[in-house]
């Protein structure tokens, strides 16, 4: 469970090595300096530097979550817009019912269902891993798609195709719930904008439905969705940690689960810090982007504070 000194001399050496003889403030300052220097300690199980292990595992999770987020935006926003434009119709009722049902499906159950159906029953898609073991792809960046492009003496087209096949089931498992949530959020935003006075004024001027939607409705409806996308990022990463274990995906989630099983507390601590830092950075980036495209929001917040 930790480093246990065998004698007094080893005890003193460990105290000096980790600056435990200093005050709490000095220890915390030393901790921050080592943290920003990339010295995150070593794994208690493998003995490898944690910075190297995290930098290999984290890009795999980012790649998986980014592909899932692409599916969420590609499917969720158009379906939400379509449902909102036909609010309270039979089509809207069908899409809304499917999205509510999909939102209630547990991600682990869905992932197991995909494995049983598309991998074991039909054999259409790979069961686990990021790529077939026959492809020797050196992990230069940690992002498999980029590493394939940088690799030498490899059939890049075949490797890229195989990597995409390995992505399908994990990505769909992660994106399923978030897509359902995005449909409902977009639908509600479209309905709210359609009831605004400036939309009624645009209709009275004789603008067509297509002109009203693309010039006035879409942009104003997407503005409230951007801050909520930060919440979807958290959901995607949380679901990715579960899905990675089921699909043996070598990401940070699977790595953290293994650290829990092996009681590798130093790896668990630094892994959670890396994930939380990533989520905070993405949230801040989305908020800054939202302020950039919607300056009125900053004025509104300055008035309400």
Predicted regions and their residues:
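Cytoplasmic-entry segments and transmembrane alpha-helices of multi-pass inner-membrane transporters
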Residues: 79-114
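An internal, D/E-rich "acidic patch" concept
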Residues: 21-77, 305
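Hydrophobic alpha-helical transmembrane segments of membrane transport/permease proteins
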Residues: 1-29, 118-157
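Hydrophobic alpha-helical membrane-insertion segments
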Residues: 102-124, 229-233
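Hydrophobic alpha-helical segments of integral membrane proteins
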Residues: 10, 14, 24-40, 50, ...
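Alpha-helical transmembrane segments of integral membrane proteins
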Residues: 58-59, 63-91, 139-305
């Amino acid at each position: 469970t930790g480093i246990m000194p065998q004698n007094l001399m080893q005890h003193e050496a460990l105290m000096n090595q980790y600056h435990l003889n200093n005050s709490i403030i000095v220890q915390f300052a030393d901790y921050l300096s080592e943290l920003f220097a990339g010295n995150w300690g070593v794994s208690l199980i493998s003995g490898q530097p944690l910075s190297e292990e995290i930098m290999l595992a984290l890009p795999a999770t980012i790649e998986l979550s980014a592909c899932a987020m692409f599916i969420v935006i590609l499917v969720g926003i158009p379906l939400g817009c379509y449902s909102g434009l036909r609010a309270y119709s039979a089509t809207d009722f069908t899409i809304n019912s499917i999205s509510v049902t999909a939102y209630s499906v547990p991600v682990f159950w869905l992932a197991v269902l995909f494995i049983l159906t598309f991998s074991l029953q039909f054999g259409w898609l790979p069961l686990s891993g990021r790529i077939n073991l026959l492809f020797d792809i050196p992990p230069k960046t940690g992002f498999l798609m980029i590493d394939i492009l940088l690799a030498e003496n490899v059939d890049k087209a075949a490797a890229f195709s195989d990597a995409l096949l390995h992505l399908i089931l994990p990505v769909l498992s992660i994106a399923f719930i978030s897509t359902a949530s995005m449909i409902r959020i977009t639908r509600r935003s479209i309905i709210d904008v359609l009831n605004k006075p400036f939309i009624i004024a645009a209709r009275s001027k004789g603008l067509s439905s297509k002109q009203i939607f693309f010039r006035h409705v879409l942009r104003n409806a997407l503005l409230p969705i951007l801050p909520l996308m930060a919440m979807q990022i958290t959901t995607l990463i949380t679901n990715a940690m579960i899905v990675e274990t089921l699909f043996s995906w070598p990401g940070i989630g699977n790595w953290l689960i293994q650290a829990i099983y092996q009681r590798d507390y130093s790896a668990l601590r630094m892994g959670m810090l890396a994930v939380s830092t990533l989520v905070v950075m993405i949230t801040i980036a989305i908020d800054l982007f939202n302020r950039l495209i919607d300056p009125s929001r900053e004025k509104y917040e300055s008035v309400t504070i």
